Amino acid sequence: VVPYGLGSPRSKRALENLLPTKATDRENRCQCASQKDKKCWNFCQAGKELRAKDLMEKGWNNHKKGKDCSKLGKKC
């Protein structure tokens, strides 16, 4: 229990209770309350696409630095 300001103490929120448990849920930026909410849906999907792009770029940068070519016996 932790105090929050001048009000009554409240229980501490555990981070593991807030995180999704399924692997597919972790891929999404967020979850919309309504599937008909187009703005929310676009925002959540945009985060997923940006993370995929970042991962692809990181992999390519490592490849250019020669980190992924060690099995070939050459530097890229």
UniProtKB/Swiss-Prot annotation:
One of its GO terms (biological process) is endothelin receptor signaling pathway. It comes from the Eukaryota. GO terms for cellular component: extracellular space. GO terms for molecular function: endothelin A receptor binding; endothelin B receptor binding; hormone activity. Residues 30-44 are annotated as: Endothelin-like. It is found in: Secreted. The keyword S-adenosyl-L-methionine does not apply. The keyword Secreted applies. InterPro entries: Endothelin, Endothelin_toxin_CS, Endothln-like_toxin. Keywords: Cleavage on pair of basic residues, Secreted, Vasoactive, Vasoconstrictor. Its main location: secreted. Endothelins are endothelium-derived vasoconstrictor peptides. Probable ligand for G-protein coupled receptors EDNRA and EDNRB which activates PTK2B, BCAR1, BCAR3 and, GTPases RAP1 and RHOA cascade in glomerular mesangial cells. Also binds the DEAR/FBXW7-AS1 receptor. Promotes mesenteric arterial wall remodeling via activation of ROCK signaling and subsequent colocalization of NFATC3 with F-actin filaments. NFATC3 then translocates to the nucleus where it subsequently promotes the transcription of the smooth muscle hypertrophy and differentiation marker ACTA2. Belongs to the endothelin/sarafotoxin family. This is Endothelin-1. The gene is EDN1.
